[in-house]
Swiss-Prot record:
Its EC number is 5.3.1.16. This is 1-(5-phosphoribosyl)-5-[(5-phosphoribosylamino)methylideneamino] imidazole-4-carboxamide isomerase. It comes from Leptospira borgpetersenii serovar Hardjo-bovis (strain JB197). Belongs to the HisA/HisF family. Transmembrane segments: none annotated. Keywords: Amino-acid biosynthesis, Cytoplasm, Histidine biosynthesis, Isomerase.
Amino acid sequence: MIIIPAIDLFDNCAVRLFKGNYKEKKIYSSEPWKLAEGFAKNGATLLHLVDLNGARNQLGINEDSILKIRKTTSLKVQLGGGIRDKEKLAYYDKIGIDRFILGTAAVTDPDLLKFALDNYGKERVVVAVDAIDGIVKIAGWEKDSGVRYRDLMDRLAKAGIEHIVFTDIAQDGTLAGPNLKAYQEILNSYPFQVIASGGISSLKDLMDLSSLKTKIPLYGVITGKALYEGKLDLAKAISSI
């Protein structure tokens, strides 16, 4: 299980939201590329980068920060937020993004999902399944899709998706701990390589996730707020798992 530090970009700053609420955001840095450099020095290998403006269809706002992060860090980068057409995929491929995260498009545009798989391969395509009360949220978590996350996962498995990020929005940004039951059910029911996201607050949370009794082990865990608030030491976490 790998530990994946997160940077969420809003207006070119690193921020964290509380339960996905844009009105409850806290700014942690106006130089997010420096955060990425620090994560690399502490032993991370993969960065989870989210364009929050892009997720709300406010395109291009964080472009400079995304480019600078890509140019200044040795980390592999998986990027999501607003990837809803072939042109955006091609652009991110051109600037060296390693993995593309599709969220809204995975629900609303199965043709784009197939295009991404066919042209970039299963290892580079990740689907974000973001849910609250069992229902998938889209468009920056501001709209209900009307689709239950288990139904979406059934579709993704049939489409050949191998990698997903599952976020329990009710836990995200709360430091209240992960939804262990949900991850256990998913890992026992589907063939995905699953990355957990939402609620991580301590090394104990990571240990609890890594020790889940499941058919497939958890692939990785995303953590953001716990790092920024000093609740979790990245180097220690990486060496302990």
